[in-house]
């Protein structure tokens, strides 16, 4: 039975055209399993499931008169947020994070998000395109195998790409290519003068690319596609996956600048199930394919670069980026033990990005063993979703609050509430897996 400390929420979803189609989408599977009265249209994309207090796509408390989570929080902020969270984040109406599931069939826009200072400046100058004054750090956790772009490639790889791919060389110009290749200094300690100069050179290259006329991009795209067909070996020493990737993304966004700034300049990241990456403010990134759990600060501020028909703010984009140039492996997040979670789970690990708004706890039970896990009360609100398997969830020691939790079910947990997860080991063909987004202060 629901209580005001633990209750199930029905979450809204988005049918953006980049989403996976029909029941191939994890979002669609979760939506239907959570509410079988919702029929999945096998011709429509199901892109995002939103879990939180965002007014655009509200989550509703099923057993509390279908009130929105935002209305519940607004009515009783001390109970649902806690005084420390209200004080720290300055809002008594909303969670400081938005929790999502994304199912990606087609590439999303290459984008970056401002930090808090720039977010406030952009909002003041252009509230139409920048609707709030917050930053928007994000974390992506793979639910199925995932690929994306994240941050600029290491500079030695970029130098090799500029020297090897004639079409990119043609766009940037030989003079700037030579300046970049001869000017970068490696290794360079972060913050050193060599590092500062390296970033300035990278900014010049990226700025030149992003300010190239569309006609030139179209001409060079035709040549680049021909090269991926006739001379795929050209890309062997850079990344042997590039010919297929360029052709695939060109079918989705023909003649797009993203083929150059994404495929050739950014890290192509693959995540296996359970792996994660943190997307820092002012670093370029894009999601290409797969199903992910995503958590972000509550903001809609996006500065776009490519693979989009939407507004591209090239001037601010080129000026704002950090121009960090780390390897793929450094983009991935390390996992941490979570000592406040104890019991029979084979895995209970923390994804803890270097920002205040959110962390995510993953808990997995072996399908053949079942068992019970107790997670101590947290000093802030949280949202739990089951992505595989089934079991029960309850307030620790209070059997009257015990409820079924199945794949796609989502629950809100009030601050300070210790919860108990129990895996259903009978006829379970999947490991019972939950993700829990939370904030503490």
UniProtKB/Swiss-Prot annotation:
Residues at the site labelled Its modification inactivates the enzyme: 150
Molecular function, one GO term: mannose-6-phosphate isomerase activity
Subcellular location: Cytoplasm
Binding residues for Zn(2+): 111, 113, 138, 285
One Gene Ontology cellular component annotation held by this UniProt entry: cytosol
CDD domains: cupin_PMI_type_I_N
InterPro entries: Man6P_Isoase-1, Mannose-6-P_Isomerase, Pmannose_isomerase-type1_CS, PMI_typeI_C, PMI_typeI_cat, PMI_typeI_hel, RmlC-like_jellyroll, RmlC_Cupin_sf
EC top class named in words: isomerase
PROSITE patterns linked to this entry: PMI_I_1, PMI_I_2
Active site, UniProt feature: 304
EC code: 5.3.1.8
Catalyzed reactions per annotation: D-mannose 6-phosphate = D-fructose 6-phosphate
Cofactor note: Binds 1 zinc ion per subunit.
Keyword terms of this UniProt record: Cytoplasm, Isomerase, Metal-binding, Zinc
GO biological process, one term: protein glycosylation
Cofactor(s) named in the record: Zn(2+)
Associated pathway: Nucleotide-sugar biosynthesis; GDP-alpha-D-mannose biosynthesis; alpha-D-mannose 1-phosphate from D-fructose 6-phosphate: step 1/2
Function (record text): Involved in the synthesis of the GDP-mannose and dolichol-phosphate-mannose required for a number of critical mannosyl transfer reactions.
Family of this protein: Belongs to the mannose-6-phosphate isomerase type 1 family.
NCBIfam families: manA
Description of how the protein assembles with itself and partners: Monomer.
Listed name of the protein: Mannose-6-phosphate isomerase
């Amino acid at each position: 039975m629901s209580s005001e400390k633990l209750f199930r929420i029905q979450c809204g979803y988005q049918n953006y055209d980049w989403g996976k189609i029909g029941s191939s989408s994890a979002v669609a599977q979760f939506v239907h399993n959570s509410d079988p009265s919702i029929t999945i249209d096998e011709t429509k994309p199901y892109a995002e499931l939103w879990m939180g207090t965002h007014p655009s796509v509200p989550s509703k408390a099923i057993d509390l008169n279908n009130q929105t989570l935002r209305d519940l929080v607004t009515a009783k902020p001390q109970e649902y947020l806690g005084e420390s969270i209200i004080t720290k984040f300055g809002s008594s109406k909303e969670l400081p994070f938005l929790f999502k599931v994304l199912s990606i069939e087609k590439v999303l826009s290459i984008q970056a998000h401002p930090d808090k200072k720039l977010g406030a400046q952009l909002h003041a100058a252009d509230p139409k395109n920048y609707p709030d004054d917050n930053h928007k750090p994000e974390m992506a956790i793979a639910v199925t195998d995932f690929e994306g772009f994240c941050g600029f490639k290491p500079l030695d790889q970029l130098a090799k790409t500029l020297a090897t791919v004639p079409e990119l060389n043609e766009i940037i110009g030989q003079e700037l290519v030579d300046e970049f290749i001869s000017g970068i200094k490696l290794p360079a300690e972060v913050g050193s003068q060599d590092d500062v100069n390296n970033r300035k050179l990278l900014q010049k290259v990226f700025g030149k690319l992003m300010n190239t006329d569309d006609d030139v991009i179209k001409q060079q795209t035709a040549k680049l596609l021909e090269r991926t067909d006739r001379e795929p070996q050209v890309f062997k020493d850079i990344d042997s996956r590039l010919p297929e990737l360029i052709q695939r993304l060109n079918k989705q966004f023909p003649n797009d600048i993203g083929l150059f700034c994404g495929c050739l300049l950014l890290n192509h990241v693959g995540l296996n199930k359970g792996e994660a990456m943190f997307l820092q403010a002012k670093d370029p990134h894009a999601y290409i394919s797969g199903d992910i759990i995503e958590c972000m600060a509550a903001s809609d501020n996006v500065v776009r670069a490519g693979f989009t028909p939407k507004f591209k703010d090239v001037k601010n984009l080129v000026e704002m980026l950090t121009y960090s140039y780390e390897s793929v492996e450094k983009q991935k997040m390390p996992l941490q033990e979570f000592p406040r979670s104890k019991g029979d789970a084979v895995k209970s690990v923390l994804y803890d990005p270097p920002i205040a708004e959110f962390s995510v706890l993953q808990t997995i039970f072996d399908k053949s063993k079942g068992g019970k896990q107790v997670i101590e009360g947290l000093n802030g609100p949280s949202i739990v979703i089951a992505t595989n398997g089934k079991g029960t969830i309850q307030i620790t020691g209070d059997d009257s609050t015990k409820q079924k939790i199945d794949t796609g079910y989502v629950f809100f947990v009030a601050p300070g509430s210790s919860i108990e997860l129990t895996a259903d080991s009978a006829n379970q063909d999947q490991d019972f897996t939950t993700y829990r987004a939370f904030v503490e202060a």
